[in-house]
């Protein structure tokens, strides 16, 4: 399974946030899908988007929920230096 999150260039994040988001999202997805050797990438693009390749519709929905939970809890796991 391959997961790609794009964040609109018009809403820049603090330094280090892209890498931190990718790491936290990978950790949470690995916890929810322990048999998955999936790759998670987070990058800037023209618009916000979530792309999940090689997953069932139900898995895509769960990954979308995990992304939402991760984003909403950023104050708990992101430390800006």
Swiss-Prot record:
It holds the Pfam family DinI. It comes from the Bacteria. GO terms for molecular function: enzyme binding. InterPro entries: DinI-like_sf, DNA_damage-inducible_DinI-like. Keywords: DNA damage, DNA repair, SOS response. One of its GO terms (biological process) is DNA repair. The keyword DNA repair applies. Gene3D superfamilies: DinI-like (3.30.910.10). Belongs to the DinI family. Involved in SOS regulation. Inhibits RecA by preventing RecA to bind ssDNA. Can displace ssDNA from RecA. PANTHER family: DNA DAMAGE-INDUCIBLE PROTEIN I, DNA DAMAGE-INDUCIBLE PROTEIN I-RELATED. This is DNA damage-inducible protein I. It comes from Escherichia coli (strain K12).
């Amino acid at each position: 399974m391959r997961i790609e999150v794009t964040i609109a260039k018009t809403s820049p994040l603090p330094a280090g946030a892209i890498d931190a988001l990718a790491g936290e999202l990978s950790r949470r997805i690995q916890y929810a899908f322990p048999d998955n050797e999936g790759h998670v990438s987070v990058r800037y693009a023209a618009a916000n988007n979530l792309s999940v390749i090689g997953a069932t519709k139900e898995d895509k929905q769960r990954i979308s929920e995990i992304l939402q939970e991760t984003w909403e809890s950023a104050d708990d796991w992101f430390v800006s230096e």
